[in-house]
């Protein structure tokens, strides 16, 4: 069995020789082997392919010259598996007649090398019969009555499509590297030349020449969908800039989704995709009334975050009857149960008095007593609009991530960005700095307000920032000045997020970090505007979840 990775690989040539072919789609949890053999900044897909090849008994691997990362992958595989057929097929960037002739010759050279390696023989007539019988792979299509989503960018694994399917969304097109079905042209006079022409006439990848009219093809496809997910792979140089260019002229909502091709990022991917779908169809969570006559109706929203679990009980008049904030422990389900019991006690209600419960936050799917779950992006938008309808831009800094959310006048999400791959600038980061300065978390923000010397924290990596703080302590700098420097570093990072969604006033800050006056002041200075902060900023997401619950029952 030979493995391959690229749509330009002449798969049918090998299949006609009786060789089993398998497209390598990495499904890994770590890059242990790649970290030993490859540079840290090599693209995550290339690392994943190496891990898969190390696990499976491939006869060989067919690679193409699509990027430098794949070239380095070839070097590593060639050195590590000298007994296998590791072949780099040099794919031309030009797709016209000269490119077709060049690629045909290179394919013939590869066939000759494989014949020497395997002892098999390529028969052009047998190949012709094989491709005549080859069924064209089924293409995607728009579906009436469904939310139609297009996928663009770098190749994406099946988990993304599975999440879309679970949420009843239809993939109307997939223009990633291997998303479309293979295009096979049959030319009985010039068999291999015709086949090669078909390979190079597929939807062009980013490395192909500009004359391939990729932008026009995207424009044509984009008109058939409600929204587009643009996927990039960590450390991939080919696609990230295309998203920025498309964002400037494409008249469809777009979600930029970067993955590292490991299972570890599945929860973050799910949150982004579900929030994007919710923003495209905000009415999706409205259900049929399940009222209880004249009896007062109560609903609950519960936000399971990494640091705190927050619950809100709301009545049918949209009034908050009680809320609770408890520390999230090692088990999100246990914390959620504790928050439930506490908020019911405060409201003087029993569990059976609650008509509907909506969960949100990273632990939302682990809350067994919830009737439904909604992403924290949508819930923060709805909650912010509830507390202040003038709010258009939200900065949410929680325990493990930061978010910037742009709302329309109805409180619906227009755009959002998240930072959940780095602890810097989050509540956990502040806790670490407070421990280093030997002050409580509550004191950290207060002492920052008494600063007299401007200190700049140059590193926003949480590990390096801690080392920088230790160096400042060694230089006998005042705690207040260091704390203020940390607050401004967080504000700088937050400002970058806000700029990406568009800084439309009024502004609101939510999450536990909104209780830190030092960070609040630093952010206000950076954006040049005041921040609206409600009395309990940690319950905004839970309040939004409760509002979603009301829409289900009223």
Regions found by a protein language model. Name each.
Residues 1-298, 317, 422-429:
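An N-terminal assembly and electron-transfer interface module characteristic of large anaerobic redox
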Residues 252-260, 376-377, 524-543:
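Conserved phosphate-binding/catalytic loops in two-lobed NTP-binding clefts
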Residues 293-317, 392-411:
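Gly/Thr-rich phosphate-binding beta-strand-loop-beta motif of the actin/hexokinase/Hsp70
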Residues 301-334, 338, 413-416, 420-421:
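Short glycine-rich, Thr/Ser-proximal phosphate-binding strand/loop in the N-terminal lobe
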Residues 331-332, 409-453, 547:
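Glycine-rich phosphate-binding loop plus the immediately following alpha-helix
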Residues 362, 499, 503-526, 538-541:
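Glycine-rich phosphate-binding loops at beta-strand->alpha-helix junctions
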Residues 430, 534-554:
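Glycine-rich phosphate-binding/hydrolytic loop that grips phosphoryl groups
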Residues 465-498, 538:
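Adenine-nucleotide phosphate-binding core of ATP-dependent small-molecule kinases
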